[in-house]
Amino acid sequence: MKLSRISAINWNKIQDDKDLEVWNRLTSNFWLPEKVPLSNDIPAWQTLSAAEQQLTIRVFTGLTLLDTIQNIAGAPSLMADAITPHEEAVLSNISFMEAVHARSYSSIFSTLCQTKEVDAAYAWSEENPPLQRKAQIILAHYVSDEPLKKKIASVFLESFLFYSGFWLPMYFSSRGKLTNTADLIRLIIRDEAVHGYYIGYKYQIALQKLSAIEREELKLFALDLLMELYDNEIRYTEALYAETGWVNDVKAFLCYNANKALMNLGYEALFPPEMADVNPAILAALSPNADENHDFFSGSGSSYVMGKTVETEDEDWNF
């Protein structure tokens, strides 16, 4: 069998400047959950009711499931369709950071929660029909041989499906609760925003090579898939937040982010403003300066703790 020639990646010869731009953004944004002082949230966690704690654990377990899908199936499936080696490299970075995101929720659990409560949430996630359904819908497209439909599914996961879960820590943060946990979630949101934008960009570039009929067919597919996911997400939200009185607020947040997902694909918003009218407190919590602890763009700040080096002299070690 004749082996094909393998070419080394050359970052000094870029076919698409967006690959380097996004690579630089992702690497400059790099972070790890161990650097966020989650233990500072223990007092606030203890003020939550048992129902609020259970809701939070379930929300984060659902998010862990989505990150796991994107890490082991989503980004790797997109790599097979990459046009440039630099695109493959960016997608490998995306895959790794999805693993970091999944690890982050385990850091929250080990810091704030009892093991039996977390185990119960994981068991719940495996038996929750809407949660399992959205995973199945997305995975079905990841294993298909249609590259652009994979990208559509990936953008909807990155830019839409996460947000029924992201709403809760932003809500608590807007009330001064679990602020360090919210800082960690903002780091995740920052990553997901870049992921959704980049994959949507690659989708739009690929569309330019298609006929008008093919483009229209993909648009209709995207809208149908979004509505299938939206209807399922409404069921998930109504069940998850049933006892809270927050269901309508979360639904508005879903519509808001569904519109953003469509825009990442180059399409117009679907949901009217009155359906996507998000509570200003939530939008403020999402903003880069939402918490004084957190520097959104550099990943630094008092809630993201990096070690500092100080030069010493020999006499410093004479105790």
From Swiss-Prot:
Protein name per Swiss-Prot or TrEMBL: Ribonucleoside-diphosphate reductase 2 subunit beta
Residues binding Fe cation 1: D67, E98, H101
GO cellular component: ribonucleoside-diphosphate reductase complex
GO molecular function, one term: ribonucleoside-diphosphate reductase activity, thioredoxin disulfide as acceptor
Annotated EC: 1.17.4.1
Function: Provides the precursors necessary for DNA synthesis. Catalyzes the biosynthesis of deoxyribonucleotides from the corresponding ribonucleotides. R2F contains the tyrosyl radical required for catalysis.
Residues given in the record as Fe cation 2 binding sites: E98, E158, E192, H195
UniProt keyword terms in alphabetical order: Deoxyribonucleotide synthesis, Iron, Metal-binding, Oxidoreductase
Single GO BP term: deoxyribonucleotide biosynthetic process
PANTHER family in alphabetical order: RIBONUCLEOSIDE-DIPHOSPHATE REDUCTASE SMALL CHAIN, RIBONUCLEOSIDE-DIPHOSPHATE REDUCTASE SUBUNIT M2
Family: Belongs to the ribonucleoside diphosphate reductase small chain family.
Co-factor remark: Binds 2 iron ions per subunit.
Recorded catalytic activity of this chain's protein: a 2'-deoxyribonucleoside 5'-diphosphate + [thioredoxin]-disulfide + H2O = a ribonucleoside 5'-diphosphate + [thioredoxin]-dithiol
Catalytic residues identified in the record: Y105
Coiled-coil ranges from the UniProt annotation: none
A family per Pfam: Ribonuc_red_sm
GN (gene name): nrdF
Top-level taxon of the source organism: Bacteria
Cofactor: Fe cation
NCBIfam families from the UniProt entry: PRK09614.1-1, PRK09614.1-2, PRK13965.1, RNR_1b_NrdF
Enzyme category, top tier: oxidoreductase
Subunit structure: Tetramer of two alpha and two beta subunits.
